[in-house]
């Protein structure tokens, strides 16, 4: 029984002493990683604006190409709300103020001519 206690005590002392050493090593490793991380963060801070500028340039380029090759916008069908200043009603339809059923909507709708 005493040998079990002595063995347990010996293992406990070794675990505590090695645990302290590991704790110090871990602390030093964390300091090294944070120092390396600062360099990485500086690199990332410089890289991020460059990437954003590249993406923005690509998007603007796509928009300009799209506007050159764009087709006419789709038209609005009958009985659908439209904008009186920019009517996009299909051919044969006109953007008019509603009569009877839609008076309370305060909007314009596409109607047949």
From Swiss-Prot:
<dbReference type="Pfam" id="PF08092">
    <property type="entry name" value="Toxin_22"/>
</dbReference>
<comment type="function">
    <text>Probable ion channel inhibitor.</text>
</comment>
<keyword id="KW-0732">Signal</keyword>
<keyword id="KW-0960">Knottin</keyword>
<feature type="disulfide bond">
    <location>
        <begin position="82"/>
        <end position="95"/>
    </location>
</feature>
<comment type="similarity">
    <text>Belongs to the neurotoxin 14 (magi-1) family. 01 (HNTX-16) subfamily.</text>
</comment>
<dbReference type="GO" id="GO:0005576">
    <property type="term" value="C:extracellular region"/>
</dbReference>
<keyword id="KW-0800">Toxin</keyword>
<feature type="propeptide">
    <location>
        <begin position="22"/>
        <end position="74"/>
    </location>
</feature>
<feature type="signal peptide">
    <location>
        <begin position="1"/>
        <end position="21"/>
    </location>
</feature>
<protein>
    <recommendedName>
        <fullName>U11-theraphotoxin-Hhn1a</fullName>
    </recommendedName>
</protein>
<feature type="disulfide bond">
    <location>
        <begin position="89"/>
        <end position="110"/>
    </location>
</feature>
<keyword id="KW-1015">Disulfide bond</keyword>
<keyword id="KW-0872">Ion channel impairing toxin</keyword>
<keyword id="KW-0964">Secreted</keyword>
<feature type="region of interest" description="Disordered">
    <location>
        <begin position="59"/>
        <end position="83"/>
    </location>
</feature>
<feature type="compositionally biased region" description="Basic and acidic residues">
    <location>
        <begin position="59"/>
        <end position="69"/>
    </location>
</feature>
<dbReference type="GO" id="GO:0019871">
    <property type="term" value="F:sodium channel inhibitor activity"/>
</dbReference>
<dbReference type="GO" id="GO:0090729">
    <property type="term" value="F:toxin activity"/>
</dbReference>
<dbReference type="InterPro" id="IPR012627">
    <property type="entry name" value="Toxin_22"/>
</dbReference>
<feature type="disulfide bond">
    <location>
        <begin position="75"/>
        <end position="90"/>
    </location>
</feature>
